[in-house]
Regions:
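Canonical position 11/12 of the leucine-rich repeat
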Residues: 75-79, 102-106, 125-128, 145-147, ...
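Conserved hydrophobic beta-strand positions in leucine-rich repeat
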Residues: 68, 81, 92-95, 108, ...
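Residue-level signal for tight coil/turn positions that link beta-strands
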Residues: 38-40, 134-136, 164, 206, ...
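Polar/charged low-complexity regions in secreted precursors and cytosolic/nuclear IDRs
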Residues: 82, 98, 107-109, 128, ...
């Protein structure tokens, strides 16, 4: 009888231990959900474990997250991503590749990321709004649905690129440290860069600009204004210009030693085709 009792007790203890162990295995930690490499880069998220609404932790294990680099169509399943806890975040890039139309991500908020320097997003077709922190130096927005964008807090921004989206209006008057500015395939009707005296590289293509003033940008080294309605470009006050790209037939006023390229309609069609293929 005692032996039977001991045997039953042993079996019950074994069951309890196995149940406890299986319970431990079911506990999901940040290490199971997020992969951070030795360079403090978050490069993988297991969406099966996190679900579509992501809250990124400050660190995974002892590894503090400083960079977020997500490059895969898999991440088109993300509905929201909260990075407010990532206090050491310096770099954020999200590229959904060719599944952008399936994305539901409408907003990115970096207002809490005081060390963030670079923001880059590509093929996030649902994205309508980005809230920046004043620390940002570089902003690159490709293939989004952003119509309006507030850049007033970005006094230290040095690089801004917007390409292929419905952008209607943008104000650069407070971005006086901007050195590189590129806008392509957007709905803007005018771009005022008079306040950008440090500007070195400017590109504007695939927009309905009728005229353009670069007289207040003495440090300008390259200018690309093609596939627009601009017919005259005055470079009289731009002695540092090294390269000019304009539509065929554009009148250039002022003496310049810059290399000049005139874009034909055939050139532009070829470029459009390459962009569509990529």
């Amino acid at each position: 009888m005692i032996r039977k009792y001991l045997a039953m007790t042993a079996i019950m203890l074994s069951c309890v231990i196995m149940l406890a162990l299986s319970s431990c295995n079911l506990t999901i930690t940040d290490k199971d959900k997020f992969y951070v490499d030795e360079n403090h880069r978050l490069t993988k998220i297991d969406l099966e474990k996190t679900g579509p609404d992501i809250v990124v932790p400050e660190k995974v294990g002892d590894n503090v997250i400083r960079r977020i680099s997500l490059y895969d169509r898999y991440f088109s399943k993300i509905d929201t991503i909260d990075v407010s806890n990532v206090s050491e975040l310096e770099f954020f890039k999200l590229n959904l590749l060719d599944d952008s139309n399936y994305s539901k991500l409408k907003m990115l908020d970096f207002s809490k990321n005081k060390k963030l320097r670079t923001v880059g997003v590509n093929r996030t077709k649902a994205l309508e709004e980005v809230v920046f922190n004043k620390s940002c130096r570089s902003v690159l927005l490709f293939n989004t649905s952003i119509k309006k964008i507030d850049l007033n807090v970005l006094e230290n921004m040095e690089h801004f690129t917007y390409f292929n989206g419905p952008l209607e209006d943008v104000d650069f008057s407070n971005n006086i440290n901007l050195e590189q500015l590129h806008i392509g395939n957007a709905n803007v009707k005018s771009v005022d860069i008079k306040m950008l005296k440090k500007l070195k590289n400017f590109g504007c293509y695939g927009v309905c600009l009728d005229e353009f003033d670069i007289s207040n940008n003495p440090d300008l080294e390259t200018i690309e204004v093609f596939n627009t309605n601009v017919k005259v470009l005055d470079v009289s006050n731009n002695p540092k210009l090294k390269k000019i790209e304009v539509d065929e037939g554009t009148e250039i006023i002022g003496e310049t030693n810059a290399e000049i390229k005139y874009w034909t309609k055939e050139d532009i069609e070829k470029m459009k085709k390459r962009l569509e293929e990529n």
